[in-house]
């Protein structure tokens, strides 16, 4: 049984199987670093240097690696507490300036213990602006920001709150398993306001400096108001900052004379001189900041932070909108007066980064880090531009075209709509096909970027979904807008103008060959409209373009895999079903990869089979040769030996010596010549066998033609034959998807081989990993029959409904003006989720806003719950070929569906207790409507509100909620914000992944030291390339935490798991499945370290999140609840532990059934828990049930059955003893004339017996003596008592039958 318990407590998300060899990764870690003389510097060398600061010649020791770059050391310096004030400086070694982009090893005569001097530089205007931004951040003077892309509270983390509660928990409370989800767990506890260091620091209205002062070195002017209330006018000069003579009405930026003539190179130092209270306040601010985990405070720079779907109300401390004049000046501080700092040539940057050398490890690190940062910057810029385009803030380049055909350029990014504005996809499904094609294109670009083929370039590509619009952002390829000469094609390779013309520029062949080989695409023929044949390396839809920069670009990567023809034929054959929206139903690249592997296995099997007979024949021939050779050698040896014995004795002696020779090869009595021949012969035989068994996989080749079933018309018989063969291969791939991929997934889930998904995101990830398209959700839901797959069915149906709602909402939002979108979203949500509270919801629109948009399409007003349900049912039937149950809307889990919808549409809802039913309304106080960002509206009658509204209409539109006469679950004010959903094409780091995989392999091969070095190298590479706050870094922390846990490095595992939790919360989401699993791992590792109390609190938090993400009774909860019960036993909380075991058993019975081995295992553990909780009778009953199930399922000889039998015997013996002792006590009391209600928990001997029995490591034989089942039954009857007159005993049994009821009465939980 111990083995089963350990199995249940295994870390979540086991590491994937490695793919690369340790030799490859050894190359990653072992490329030598050389100094300027070419001499090798050992990799693990660390130089101890001393940084000498300019003020007071203060010295700071610093340890650096020789392969670090100087600008990394610079960054480390400015993050040190003693050097915070420096931002504009250079470093010098022995009087010589050091290049910021050189490696430490390249510094001339650098040696361990050397001093590096920090030398302050003159400021430029840009450096002065950067310095001001940095100082504002450091002293906490920067106010809150309104960010259109990242939303409200981006990169939220609740770890600090959870950890504080875990540390401060004094006693283990009774956990409410039946309680509903608590959305408060999604938000951190409100902190005290941070200490204020200055009242204000802002750019002066005297900016920019006039020409004659600019000539004197003036860069910008500032105003600082200290905490003492004094205001100072500051000049930013090339030499630093000083107090000037200006006032708010008089301009004199020259230095002030007299006692207040303060000046300093750093603004931070200057403020310290100006304000006596600053130093103390700044120290308090740093102390305040240090109370939180550093990872939860760092700014996220290399990824778009996760935006929470539930945010505090506008009146909360976390979202208070404070006045900050500099917030309006930030665009100037960031990009300057001319706004030239932020304009970047994205395409040139991408392609130049791709062309960087990648020979050595440091070259690859630098290249991949630059590419990662570049993609992060581009994705952010493209998302911001897309939001502006969607809101109508950017003028189109072709305003006379239809809305969907308009194109835009903003911030050097080219934008277009993901719709069929020019009729390109008319035959494929119009707008729907165009929408799918853009998503497939960005995935294709990501795949090509990952392959990193030399000489083949892609534009930076991003797809943004925002308020129903899909917008594509691409870096501008040089020459893409160029007007071509007559007869010259716009495209150099692939289809031109649909598929009427096909271009075949030979310059693209080498690169497209590499691409097609990697993507398993078959070189094939296509035909233009005139029937002319063209041989292409890739799909006709994949285009090649030679830019004016001479680079070869690949475009339109939405058809890199073949069509799912089985799906198309199936939906076309359904006469009564609605038509599928488009014909862009391509197979996933993951499926093609899996199918090719399957084909490879089949090929290897056939090769083995082919060689089988030949091998047998060859073996027979060799046996004959060996027999002949042996006979010759025997005759030779017999003639050479001299012996006086007869011939038969000689033969016996010879054979005996041969046998000894096999055991002892150095026996001298055997002829050396014969032994040598035998050895050579065996070696040759082994070599032959090895060479014959080895199959060269490079001989295998299997590719698919992506253009079959897409209108290609072969001309000759040979071409038709080739096309038919290609079509068969594609049909086989489609068959593999339906007959193998989907059934394998269902089987793995049914057998608990993999974790069940919890929500739509995890379901999508799981299906895509298995190569299954989401259009098969309907089939998966239909096939998920039985209690074991009920969870999968629920998640699949929820996902289909949420996606159906998303498409319906997108149609209404697409052309709606921004101020009306909150009314639209809230009304549609009321129709979906609020009908149990208000069966006839009405849309709430501010009349003043309505009057401003006379031409707006307000069709959402007419949507009723019935219309919305019908529309969702149609979408689900159309897209997933699934028919929802007739009353599906009555069974929706309200909060979970709200979360799914918000995540899909990017909605940020106001945090409140949502009222979904009339019963819920009775227990909730009436909500107070918000009229503006900082105040509450008085609760008045609706008529009065309407009059007020009419009077105030011309000045400021009031809150819509105040005019509401009938309450709704959602009101427009609940929709706080909408953030864009971004799909990017950023590649992952190949270098970091190689090191991680090789580390795993080394550990599997028991090369622990090398493995750990490689794991550390991988961690370092991930952090260097991505930055610390990135989803990929969260995942590597997760993987490494588990690997270190398996290596018994428990402290390191806990630290990595803690980092994984925080980084995942901030970059993936507070309530994502990945974050939840990270919390469970952290909990498990803490338990193994002996901190059961804190481990239990993290488990409870994970369960609370589970309720929000999925709800109760998720199959994977069984393991988690079981683990928590074990933790409670460790804390000697026996009664609470028993409640957790009972809950685990309840879910197990729902999922696996009562008569299952899983239930028997939990019954076994529950029986032990009952014994510890002083319930001997119940313990015997549960152990007997466990024994009977094991006996029926596994047989009498199984170790689990024997162990249960042994426990049953001992528990029964102890229970009989306790029952007998209780009867004796009762009889003595009766004789004395006193009668008490007996309680097992009150008898002293019970506690001792229970503790004695329930030790998990009990010292006794594993296989107990067999017991007569009838005697056990008799003993049970004796324990339970047959005397009907003992009413108190009967009452006690009733109470024990439902242990959950015992929560109301005091229960002894003594050790």
From Swiss-Prot:
* SMART domains for the chain: TPR
**PANTHER family recorded:** CLUSTERED MITOCHONDRIA PROTEIN HOMOLOG (PTHR12601:SF6), EUKARYOTIC TRANSLATION INITIATION FACTOR 3 SUBUNIT EIF-3 (PTHR12601)
Q: Where is the composition biased (Low complexity)?
A: 1-18
- What role is this protein assigned? mRNA-binding protein involved in proper cytoplasmic distribution of mitochondria.
Which is an annotated GO molecular function term of this record?
Answer: mRNA binding
Please give the family membership noted in the entry. Answer: Belongs to the CLU family.
Per UniProt, the ranges with Basic and acidic residues bias are 606-630, 676-694, 1276-1286
User: Quaternary state and partners of this protein?
Assistant: May associate with the eukaryotic translation initiation factor 3 (eIF-3) complex.
Q: Where is the composition biased (Basic residues)?
A: 665-675, 1287-1301
Organism per entry: Pyricularia oryzae (strain 70-15 / ATCC MYA-4617 / FGSC 8958)
The protein's matches in InterPro entries, at most eight in alphabetical order, are given as: CLU-central, CLU_dom, CLU_N, CLU_prot, GSKIP_dom_sf, TPR-like_helical_dom_sf, TPR_rpt
GO CC, any one term: cytoplasm
Q: What is the official name of this protein in its record? A: Clustered mitochondria protein homolog
Task: Give the organism's phylogenetic lineage.
Answer: Eukaryota, Fungi, Dikarya, Ascomycota, Pezizomycotina
**Renumbered residue ranges of the record's region Disordered:** 1-27, 606-694, 925-966, 1276-1311
Q: Where in the sequence does UniProt note compositional bias of the Acidic residues kind?
A: 631-661
Where is the protein found, in the record's own terms? Answer: Cytoplasm
Q: What SUPFAM superfamilies would the database entry show?
A: Hypothetical protein c14orf129, hspc210, TPR-like
> What residues does the Clu domain cover?
324-568
Principal localisation: cytoplasm
């Amino acid at each position: 049984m111990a083995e089963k318990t350990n199995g249940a407590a295994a870390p979540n998300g086991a590491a994937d199987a490695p793919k690369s060899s340790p030799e490859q990764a050894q190359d990653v870690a072992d490329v030598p670093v050389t100094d300027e003389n070419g001499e090798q510097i050992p990799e693990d060398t660390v130089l101890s240097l001393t940084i000498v600061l300019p003020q007071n010649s203060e010295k700071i020791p610093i340890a650096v690696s020789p392969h670090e770059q100087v600008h990394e050391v610079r960054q480390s310096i400015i993050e040190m507490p003693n050097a915070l004030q420096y931002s504009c400086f250079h470093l010098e070694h022995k009087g010589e300036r050091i290049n910021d982009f050189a490696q430490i090893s390249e510094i001339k005569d650098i040696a361990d213990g050397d001093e590096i001097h920090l030398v302050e530089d003159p400021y430029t205007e840009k450096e002065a602006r950067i310095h001001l931004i940095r100082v504002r951040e450091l002293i906490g003077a920067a106010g809150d920001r309104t960010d259109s892309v990242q939303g409200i509270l981006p990169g939220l983390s609740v770890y600090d709150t959870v950890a504080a509660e875990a540390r401060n928990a004094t006693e283990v409370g009774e956990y409410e398993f039946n309680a509903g989800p608590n959305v408060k767990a999604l938000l951190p506890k409100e902190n005290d306001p941070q200490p204020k260091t200055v009242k204000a620091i802002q750019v002066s209205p005297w900016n920019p400096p006039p020409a004659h002062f600019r000539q004197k070195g003036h860069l910008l002017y500032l105003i600082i108001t200290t905490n003492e209330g004094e205001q100072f006018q500051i000049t930013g000069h090339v030499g630093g900052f000083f107090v000037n003579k200006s006032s708010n009405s008089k301009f004199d930026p020259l230095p002030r004379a007299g006692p207040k003539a303060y000046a300093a190179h750093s603004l931070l130092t200057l403020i310290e001189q100006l304000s006596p209270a600053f130093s103390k306040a700044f120290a308090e601010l740093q102390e305040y900041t240090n109370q939180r985990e550093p990872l939860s405070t760092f700014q996220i720079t290399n990824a778009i932070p996760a935006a929470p779907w539930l945010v505090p109300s506008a009146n909360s401390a976390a979202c208070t909108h404070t006045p900050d004049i500099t917030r309006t000046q930030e665009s100037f501080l960031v990009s300057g007066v001319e706004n030239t700092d932020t304009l970047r040539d994205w395409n040139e940057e991408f392609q130049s980064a791709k062309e960087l050398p990648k020979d050595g490890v440091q070259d690859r690190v630098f290249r991949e880090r630059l590419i990662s940062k570049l993609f992060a910057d581009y994705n952010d810029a493209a998302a911001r531009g897309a939001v502006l385009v969607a809101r109508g803030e950017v003028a189109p380049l072709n305003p006379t075209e239809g809305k969907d055909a308009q194109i835009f350029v903003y911030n050097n990014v080219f934008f277009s709509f993901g719709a069929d504005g020019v009729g390109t996809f008319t035959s494929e499904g119009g707008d729907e096909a165009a929408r799918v094609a853009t998503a497939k294109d960005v995935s294709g670009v990501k795949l090509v970027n990952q392959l990193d083929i030399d000489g083949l370039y892609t534009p930076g590509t991003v797809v943004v979904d925002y308020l129903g619009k899909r917008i594509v952002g691409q870096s501008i390829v040089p020459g893409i807008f160029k007007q071509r000469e007559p007869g010259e094609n716009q495209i150099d390779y692939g289809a031109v103008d649909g598929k009427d013309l096909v271009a075949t520029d030979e310059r693209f062949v080498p690169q497209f060959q590499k691409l097609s080989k990697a993507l398993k695409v078959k070189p094939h023929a296509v035909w233009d409209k005139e029937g002319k044949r063209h041989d292409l390396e890739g799909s006709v839809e994949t285009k090649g373009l030679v830019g004016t920069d001479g680079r070869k670009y690949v475009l339109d990567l939405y058809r890199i895999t073949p069509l799912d023809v089985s799906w198309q034929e199936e939906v076309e054959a359904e006469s009564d079903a609605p038509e599928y929206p488009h014909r862009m139903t391509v197979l996933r690249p993951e499926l093609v990869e899996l199918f090719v592997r399957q084909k490879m296995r089949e090929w290897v099997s056939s090769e083995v089979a082919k060689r089988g007979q030949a091998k047998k024949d060859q073996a027979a021939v060799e046996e004959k040769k060996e027999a002949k050779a042996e006979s010759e050698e025997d005759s030779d040896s017999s003639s050479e030996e001299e012996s006086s014995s007869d011939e038969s004795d000689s033969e016996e002696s010879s054979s005996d010596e041969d046998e000894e020779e096999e055991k002892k090869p150095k026996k001298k009595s055997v002829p050396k010549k014969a032994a040598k021949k035998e050895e050579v012969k065996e070696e040759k035989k082994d070599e032959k066998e090895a060479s014959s068994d080895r199959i060269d996989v490079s001989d295998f080749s299997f590719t698919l033609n992506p253009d079959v079933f897409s209108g290609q018309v072969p001309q000759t018989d040979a071409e038709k034959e080739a096309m038919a063969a290609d079509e068969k291969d594609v049909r086989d791939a489609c068959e593999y998807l339906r007959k193998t991929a989907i059934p394998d997934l269902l089987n793995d889930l049914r057998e608990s081989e993999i974790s069940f998904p919890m929500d739509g995101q995890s379901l999508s990830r799981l299906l895509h990993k298995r190569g299954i398209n989401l259009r098969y959700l309907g089939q998966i839901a239909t096939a998920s029959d039985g209690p074991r797959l009920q969870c999968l069915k629920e998640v699949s149906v929820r996902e289909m409904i949420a996606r159906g709602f998303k498409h319906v909402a997108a149609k209404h939002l697409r052309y709606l003006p921004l101020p009306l979108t909150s009314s639209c979203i809230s009304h549609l949500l009321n129709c979906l989720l609020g009908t149990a509270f208000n069966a006839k919801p009405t849309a709430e629109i501010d009349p003043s806003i309505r009057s401003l948009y006379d031409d707006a399409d307000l069709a959402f007003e007419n949507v009723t719950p019935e219309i919305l349900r019908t529309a969702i049912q149609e979408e689900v039937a159309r897209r997933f070929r699934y028919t929802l149950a007739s009353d599906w809307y009555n069974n929706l889990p309200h909060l979970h569906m709200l979360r799914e919808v918000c995540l899909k549409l990017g909605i940020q809802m106001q945090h409140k207790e949502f009222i979904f039913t009339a019963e819920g309304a009775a227990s909730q106080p009436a909500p107070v409507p918000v009229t503006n960002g900082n105040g509450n509206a008085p609760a008045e009658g609706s008529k009065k509100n309407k009059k007020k509204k009419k009077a105030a209409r011309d000045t400021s539109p009031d809150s819509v909620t105040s005019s509401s006469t009938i309450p709704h679950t959602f009101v427009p004010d609940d929709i706080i914000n909408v953030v864009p959903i971004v799909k990017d094409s950023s590649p992952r780091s190949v270098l970091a992944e190689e090191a991680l995989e090789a580390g795993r392999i080394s550990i599997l091969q028991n090369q622990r030291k090398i493995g750990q070095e490689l794991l550390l190298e991988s961690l370092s590479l991930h952090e260097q390339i991505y930055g610390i706050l990135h989803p990929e870094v969260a995942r590597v922390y997760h993987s490494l935490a588990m690997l270190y846990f398996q290596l018994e490095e428990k402290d390191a595992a806990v630290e990595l798991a803690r980092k994984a939790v925080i980084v995942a919360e901030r970059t993936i989401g507070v309530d994502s499945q990945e974050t939840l699993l990270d919390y469970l791992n952290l909990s498990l590792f803490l338990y193994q370290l002996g901190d059961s109390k804190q481990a239990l609190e993290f488990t409870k938090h994970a369960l609370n999140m589970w309720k929000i993400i999925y709800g109760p009774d998720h199959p994977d909860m069984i393991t988690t609840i079981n683990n928590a019960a074990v933790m409670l036993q460790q804390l000697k909380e026996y009664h609470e532990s028993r409640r957790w075991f009972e809950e685990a058993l309840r879910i197990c019975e729902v999922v696996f059934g009562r008569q299952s081995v899983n239930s028997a295992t939990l019954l076994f553990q529950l029986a032990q828990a009952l014994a510890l909780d002083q319930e001997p009778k119940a313990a015997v009953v549960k152990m007997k049930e466990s024994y009977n199930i094991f006996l029926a399922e596994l047989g009498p000889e199984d170790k689990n059955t024997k162990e249960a039998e042994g426990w049953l015997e001992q528990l029964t013996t102890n229970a009989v003893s306790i029952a007998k002792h209780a009867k004796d006590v009762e009889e003595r009391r009766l004789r004395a004339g006193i009668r008490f209600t007996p309680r097992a928990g009150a008898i002293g001997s019970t506690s001792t017996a229970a503790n004695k029995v329930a030790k998990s490591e009990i010292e006794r034989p594993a296989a107990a003596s067999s017991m007569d089942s009838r005697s056990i039954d008799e003993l049970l009857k004796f324990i339970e008592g047959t005397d009907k007159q003992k009413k108190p005993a009967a009452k006690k049994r009733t109470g024990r039958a439902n242990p959950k009821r015992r929560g109301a009465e005091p229960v002894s939980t003594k050790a």
